[in-house]
Amino acid sequence: MSRRGTAEEKTAKSDPIYRNRLVNMLVNRILKHGKKSLAYQIIYRAVKKIQQKTEANPLSVLRQAIRGVTPDIAVKARRVGGSTHQVPIEIGSTQGKALAIRWLLGASRKRPGRNMAFKLSSELVDAAKGSGDAIRKKEETHRMAEANRAFAHFR
């Protein structure tokens, strides 16, 4: 058994303008090559576009989109007796949010469009409405977990 002790879980910081942790998580995931100011620009432009499109509070749209995409259950590959099984496991809230943000950004990067802010805002609005690639990814993950329910006892 390790003598080091467990690492303290860091609390997510808030972003400077909206004072929102989800926005900061989004910024840290969209970040490429250490260009954080560019990541903030993209997010804030996307939030403005959401405001123009929906005429609702953009942070509530963001929250709704992330809540809609967050998976409850996922599958994890586990090797048992020479064969690999996809074992369904429950996902915690923090890990679920991280997965949701990753899926939203991946889906928005694949979208055709002018710039990342436009694509991200479109994907977030679609996810809040219950459609889009990120929602499809969540449903696919849930289907995989349901199909492999027989292997749940390998957990």
Swiss-Prot record:
An example Gene Ontology biological process: translation
InterPro entries with a match to the protein in the record: Ribosomal_uS7, Ribosomal_uS7_bac/org-type, Ribosomal_uS7_CS, Ribosomal_uS7_dom, Ribosomal_uS7_dom_sf
Alphabetical UniProt keywords: Chloroplast, Plastid, Ribonucleoprotein, Ribosomal protein, RNA-binding, rRNA-binding
Any GO MF annotation of the entry: structural constituent of ribosome
Main localization (coarse): plastid
One Pfam family it belongs to: Ribosomal_S7
Cell compartments where the protein resides: Plastid, Chloroplast
Function as written in the Swiss-Prot or TrEMBL entry: One of the primary rRNA binding proteins, it binds directly to 16S rRNA where it nucleates assembly of the head domain of the 30S subunit.
Subunit structure: Part of the 30S ribosomal subunit.
Family note: Belongs to the universal ribosomal protein uS7 family.
Official protein name in the record: Small ribosomal subunit protein uS7c
